Amino acid sequence: MELLKQRILQDGRCYPGGILKVDSFINHQMDPMLMYKIAEEFIRRFQDRKINKIVTIEASGIAPAIMVGYIMQLPVVFVKKKKPKTMENMLSTVVHSFTKDRDYTVCISNNFLTPEDHILFIDDFLAYGNAAMGMVELAEQSGAVIEGMGFIIEKAFQDGGNLLREKGIRVESLAIIDNLDDCKITVR
């Protein structure tokens, strides 16, 4: 997605350790017009799939997931990083956050992820694939079918994309970063 690539090159910032910061337009301050275009592109790429629910993980995946759900007129559910006291009948798994370097026990109500669901998982980044693999585990627990996974940005120099594709999951990334060596952003 050319508009997104240009925005990453213009406003993205690189930090040592393979970190790309896009907080000025994606995951802290958001550009709603760009987010709308991102949602339209995800919908275009997955138009051949029979999807009945959009799923993401809190927090940075919520905005693009809501946009996709709004346009497709589908419900959106997000996997929580902390179990609420009021949640019963939950599915859970452990996910490691690359950015925050910590483990989370993520959870989702089995009322909102069922064997009848054909889901599109949306998230901001695909790096090592930890959040996405957590979603795979939750889908397996629930019996839901993952129709595809859409990521705003994929870091191709980390293993997540290959891991998911090797599992036979349809992955669509709108911008692919080939490397961040010497803090120079190289977009495919």
Curated annotation (Swiss-Prot):
A Gene Ontology term for the protein's cellular component: cytoplasm
List of residues binding xanthine: 20, 27, 155
Primary localisation category: cytoplasm
Subcellular location: Cytoplasm
Annotated GO MF terms: xanthine phosphoribosyltransferase activity
Keywords noted in UniProt: Cytoplasm, Glycosyltransferase, Purine salvage, Transferase
Gene Ontology annotations of biological process type: purine ribonucleoside salvage; xanthine metabolic process; XMP salvage
UniProt cross-references to InterPro entries, sorted A to Z: PRTase-like (IPR029057), Pur/Pyrimidine_PRTase (IPR050118), Xanthine_PRibTrfase (IPR010079)
Gene3D superfamilies for the chain: 3.40.50.2020
Known catalytic reactions: XMP + diphosphate = xanthine + 5-phospho-alpha-D-ribose 1-diphosphate
Binding site for 5-phospho-alpha-D-ribose 1-diphosphate: 127-131
Keyword set includes Kinase: no
Pathway(s) this gene product operates in, as recorded in its UniProt entry: Purine metabolism; XMP biosynthesis via salvage pathway; XMP from xanthine: step 1/1
EC number: 2.4.2.22
Role description: Converts the preformed base xanthine, a product of nucleic acid breakdown, to xanthosine 5'-monophosphate (XMP), so it can be reused for RNA or DNA synthesis.
Assembly: Homodimer.
Family the entry assigns: Belongs to the purine/pyrimidine phosphoribosyltransferase family. Xpt subfamily.
UniProt protein name: Xanthine phosphoribosyltransferase
